């Protein structure tokens, strides 16, 4: 049995390190890396099990340029919504593989802590429960895995929490205090639930690892790149310069635009996301934050 992680960023590297403990696991990316177990894309695609840790915005392009056998088994470990199409990642994969052949990974998990082998709990979601169990069996003992069938809920929670983490970083950057941050996160959870419910996500998903768990982690720590984006926005830094300095992908930025567009099309009330996007477009963080604090819902 051979596994390949597609994507050699921090998260992909962390997954590779964890999975290679008990299995033959390779890692690959578009560009050559000086990494142990690194293989070409062609060699990676010869593996039966593929784990995708690419940027959500680059996923479709990668899938179009590289042939995936429809019999291959896939775990989607990226978290985001494609900005251009407003499609969830599972919808993108459906253009290339049957839904029975992929699962979605979610849950509170900083790459740095996984690489340190610190205790971590993850959720694997898919309609093929046997495949979920198979992927769960690949992980070492320090990673506890749970399985369910709520693919859409896992996708939405994983994407939405990144935007809420930016909002939380803005709140902390403005030194509004712990009370304000707690209010923002809890109201963000309600907003995320409202959005997800429209698309058929299950209620319990929002209170589990992929929902409240991942939201709390991502919205409260400087280990979160999305949270750090919010901190810098609160210092009146321009988004372009923040992202250039970050030198990593902050999925919440593009995802915020996608959620805003979807919410407008479907008539879903998403005040936090709307204000985050307004800040991206030049609105002052002080004005946007005051608007949120005055909301009655």
UniProtKB/Swiss-Prot annotation:
Please list the residues that make up the active site: 161
One Gene Ontology cellular component annotation held by this UniProt entry: cytosol
Q: Give the coiled coil ranges.
A: none
Transmembrane portions of the chain = none
Q: A GO BP term, please?
A: phospholipid biosynthetic process
In alphabetical order, the GO MF annotations are: glycerol-3-phosphate dehydrogenase [NAD(P)+] activity; NAD binding
Residues at which sn-glycerol 3-phosphate binds: 79, 107, 109, 161, 214, 224-226
Q: Where does NADPH bind?
A: 11, 33, 79, 111, 225, 249, 251
Pfam families under this entry? Answer: NAD_Gly3P_dh_C, NAD_Gly3P_dh_N
Query: What's its job?
Result: Catalyzes the reduction of the glycolytic intermediate dihydroxyacetone phosphate (DHAP) to sn-glycerol 3-phosphate (G3P), the key precursor for phospholipid synthesis.
Indicate what this protein is called per its UniProt record: Glycerol-3-phosphate dehydrogenase [NAD(P)+]
Source organism of the structure: Campylobacter jejuni subsp. doylei (strain ATCC BAA-1458 / RM4099 / 269.97)
Gene from which the chain derives: gpsA
């Amino acid at each position: 049995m051979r596994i390949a992680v597609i994507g050699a960023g921090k998260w992909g590297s962390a997954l590779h390190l964890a999975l290679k403990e008990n299995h033959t696991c390779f890692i690959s990316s578009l560009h050559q890396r000086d990494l142990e177990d690194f293989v070409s894309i062609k060699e990676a695609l010869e593996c039966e099990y593929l784990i995708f840790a690419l940027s959500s915005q680059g996923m479709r392009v990668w899938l179009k340029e590289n042939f995936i056998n429809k019999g291959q088994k896939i775990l989607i470990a990226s978290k985001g919504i494609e900005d251009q199409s407003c499609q969830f990642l599972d919808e993108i994969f459906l253009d290339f593989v049957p839904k029975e052949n992929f699962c979605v990974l979610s849950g509170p998990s900083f790459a740095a802590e996984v690489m340190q082998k610190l205790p971590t709990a993850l959720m694997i979601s898919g309609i093929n429960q046997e495949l979920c169990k198979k992927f769960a069996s690949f992980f070492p003992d320090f990673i506890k895995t749970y399985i369910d069938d709520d693919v859409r809920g896992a996708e939405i929670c994983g994407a939405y929490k990144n935007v809420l983490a930016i909002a939380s970083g803005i709140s902390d950057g403005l030194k509004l205090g712990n009370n304000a941050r707690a209010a923002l996160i809890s109201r963000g959870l309600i907003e995320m639930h409202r959005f997800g419910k429209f698309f058929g996500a299950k209620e319990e998903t929002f209170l589990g690892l992929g929902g409240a768990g991942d939201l709390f982690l991502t919205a409260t720590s400087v280990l979160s790149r999305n949270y750090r984006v919010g901190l810098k926005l609160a210092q009146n830094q321009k988004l372009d310069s923040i992202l250039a300095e970050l030198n990593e992908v902050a999925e919440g930025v593009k995802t915020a635009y996608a959620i805003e567009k979807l919410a407008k099309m479907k008539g879903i009330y998403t005040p936090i996301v709307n204000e985050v996007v307004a800040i991206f477009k030049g609105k002052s963080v002080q004005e946007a934050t005051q608007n949120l604090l005055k909301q009655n819902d």
